[in-house]
Regions:
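Bacterial N-terminal signal peptides
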Residues: 1-4
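Extracellular glycan-interacting surfaces
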Residues: 7-260
Length: 260
C-alpha cells in the first residue's frame, strides 16, 4: 500500500508556474435596457434608458455608452429607474429624463439638460413613475413638441396626462384628457404588479401646423384592453376624443405616424 502510494507520488509532475495579469473589470452600467431614443435630425445623438440602472448617452468618439445618473445618491435610488427620455427635435442639446422606479415609492422627478446631458436641473413632480414596473418596454411616455420646444407632454401610469410649457421647469395636469386608469378587482393584492401601465406613448402629427403655437394634432395611447385606448387632440391639447374605429382587443405599446 505504501509502495503504491510512493509510486503514485513519483508519477506526478510538478505544474509549471503561469504568469497572470490582473486588472479591474469595468462595470459601466446596470439594469435592463428598455428603450433607446434617437434624435430625428442629428446623427449619432442617442440615449438609452434602463429600468433601475439610470440613463446613458452614446459617445461616438469612444464608441461606448456614458452613464448620466451616477451622481444620484443611494438615498434617492428611486430616481435610477428611468420611465422615459425625450429629446428636443429642434435642439439636440435639450434632453429630458423622467425618473422614478416604482409607483409605490415617492414622487418622481424630471431631469432637464440644456447642454446635451452634461448637467441636469432637477424638477420634482407631483406624480409617481414606474421605470421598473409592467410595461417598461413600451414607447416613450414623454415627448417634446417638434414645432415648439417649450412644450413637453408626459403620460403617467396612475395620474393622467401632464404638460410643461416652459421646457420642463413646471408641469400641470391636462384635466381634459380622459380617465385611462385601469380597474382591478379590489380583492387583488395591492402591489405594483397589478397596477395599470397608464399612458404608454405619444405622437405628434406636424402636417398642416405652421403657426408657431406648436403641434395641433396629438395622439396619445394608453395600455388598456377592452375599451378605447387611443385618443387624439385637434386643438393643441385642449380637448381630447377617442379615435374612431380603433381595435380594442389589444393593448397598444408603440406608435408610428404614417403618411396617410
Amino acid at each position: 500500500m505504501l509502495g503504491g502510494m510512493s509510486m503514485l507520488a513519483q508519477d506526478i509532475s510538478p505544474v509549471n508556474s503561469v504568469s497572470y495579469e490582473w486588472k479591474s473589470v469595468p462595470i459601466v452600467g446596470g439594469g435592463f435596457v428598455d428603450g433607446i431614443v434617437f434624435h430625428p435630425e442629428a446623427p449619432g445623438i442617442r440615449y438609452c434608458r434602463t429600468d433601475m440602472g439610470g440613463a446613458y448617452r452614446w459617445d461616438a468618439a469612444s464608441c461606448q455608452w456614458t452613464p448620466l445618473l451616477d451622481w444620484i445618491s443611494l438615498d434617492e435610488s428611486n430616481l435610477q429607474g428611468v420611465e422615459s427620455i425625450a429629446i428636443d427635435p429642434q435642439n439636440p442639446q435639450n434632453v429630458y429624463i423622467a425618473c422614478g422606479t416604482y409607483t409605490s415609492s415617492s414622487n418622481g422627478a424630471i431631469l432637464c439638460s440644456y447642454d446635451g446631458g452634461r448637467t441636469f436641473a432637477r424638477v420634482d413632480v407631483p406624480f409617481t413613475m414606474g421605470g421598473n414596473e409592467n410595461g417598461r418596454g413600451n414607447g416613450e411616455r414623454m415627448m417634446v413638441d417638434p414645432q415648439n420646444g417649450n412644450i413637453i407632454y408626459m403620460g403617467t401610469r396612475l395620474h393622467g396626462l401632464w404638460r410643461s410649457m416652459d421646457k420642463g421647469q413646471s408641469w400641470a395636469r391636462v384635466v381634459s384628457f380622459p380617465d385611462v386608469s385601469e380597474k382591478f378587482n379590489p380583492a387583488d393584492r395591492a402591489a405594483w404588479g397589478n397596477r395599470g401601465s397608464g399612458i404608454v406613448c405619444i405622437v405628434y402629427d406636424v402636417q398642416g401646423t405652421q403657426d408657431g403655437r406648436g403641434t395641433r394634432d396629438i395622439y396619445v395611447a394608453a395600455s388598456l384592453m377592452g375599451r378605447e385606448n387611443l385618443f387624439v387632440s385637434h386643438d393643441y391639447g385642449e380637448s381630447w376624443r377617442p379615435v374612431g374605429g380603433q381595435p380594442v382587443q389589444y393593448r397598444p405599446t408603440h406608435m408610428v405616424l404614417t403618411g396617410d
